[in-house]
Amino acid sequence: MKDEEFWVRRSATEALEKCSSPKILPRLCEFLLTTVDSSLLRWVLNTIAAIQERCKFYNYTLTEAILVPETQLKIPPIQLIFTSLMHILHLSDLHFGTLDQANLWSNQLAADLYNDINISHLDALILSGDIANYSTDDEYKAAAQFLDNLRQDLPLNPEQIILVPGNHDLNWKLAKKAYKPVYREDYDGQLIDGHYIEESASVIGVRDETEYKQRFAHFSSFYKTIKQNPYPLEYDQQYTLDHLPEQNLLILGLNSAWELDHHYKTRASINTNALSNALTQIRRNLDYKNCLKIAVWHHPLDSAYSDRITDQGFLEQLAVNGFRLFLHGHIHKAETSLFRYDMSSDGRKLDRICAGTFGAPVREWVPGYPLQYNLLKFEDNQLTVYTRRREELNGAWKPDARWLQGAGKTPLDYYAIAL
């Protein structure tokens, strides 16, 4: 790696990435303290990350067994590529309506995290859709107030807050306005299936495509309030990438409600162009290569109802591009399952983590399922998903022991996933 030729140095780091022993790590870390080549520094960091991933050896301390010359004492400490402990809060189907809800719910949640779970720091907060109820500005003001309250107890930067839209995050009134009534016999254009509505035997509602995209405008403005940039209204740009380098984490957000409106309520899907654009961006950024990759959207793959994602081929793309987990909501009950792309024990796979509803009106609760949320705890090579429940509107959160362990055994309020 000290060769004068660029291609030789690059080839050396690529070869070391295939190393199956962690014994080389001390020498690589020592090399980091001596190199001044910024490109080589990044390659070596990627090499270390690849070795750690292959060897499942994430807790190596870069300062151990390294003798630092006195002349280099001013070199800033190197960030660990993997963290040994990480907490992600997963909320879904919040259905905000009022500022009173924002104040009550944030207080109930912070009290639970602080007092019962003993959490005073979050690495990320994921809201997997249906943040509002009717996608109005007032509802998003309540959601923003909730987040502002929560961040005063648990500080979070904008990049640590992941937001994706659900079917309640598009405004039906704006969707209706985009359909223009026309007498069928007077319409000369091409009628594309799914782009118009049969209003009567003689009248159709033809969609104004530009105006139709505005049904996500209120969500987009809310997104800008929290994330500092508006949510894209063009469908092929409706993906988000939140990279948290300190946690070695990459979270992809997708819009599974991009084809939905007041009339077409069940066309949940993932836009193939948005997914392709996202995966291309991920592949071309070396900083993302060895990250733990999580995908988030709103709708389920399996459901008793028709409002589910039926075209599930995109899961294969996520699997071969290194994604390990996907999170969603919508069904108002916590669930988990596994998508296996390879059948080998160490093959490519994605664990599914579904959160229940955090704030839906009582009339929309699933029988037997109260309000719920998930707390994801990453430690070493294991993810533990803790499920919390709240039955009383003005009550407190508590453990949700619904994960069965076998006949005659006590159910647990958590389940574990080996990473």
How would you name each of these model-derived features?
Residues 10-21, 30, 39-54:
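Structural detector for internal amphipathic alpha-helices that build alpha-solenoid repeat scaffolds
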Residues 377-419:
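A short C-terminal boundary segment appended to hydrolase-like catalytic domains
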Residues 246, 304-382:
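Conserved beta-sheet core of the metallophosphoesterase superfamily
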Residues 144-274, 317:
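Extended active-site neighborhood of metal-dependent phosphoesterases/phosphodiesterases
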Residues 1-2, 21-33, 56-64:
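Amphipathic alpha-helical scaffolding segments comprising HEAT/armadillo-like alpha-solenoid repeats
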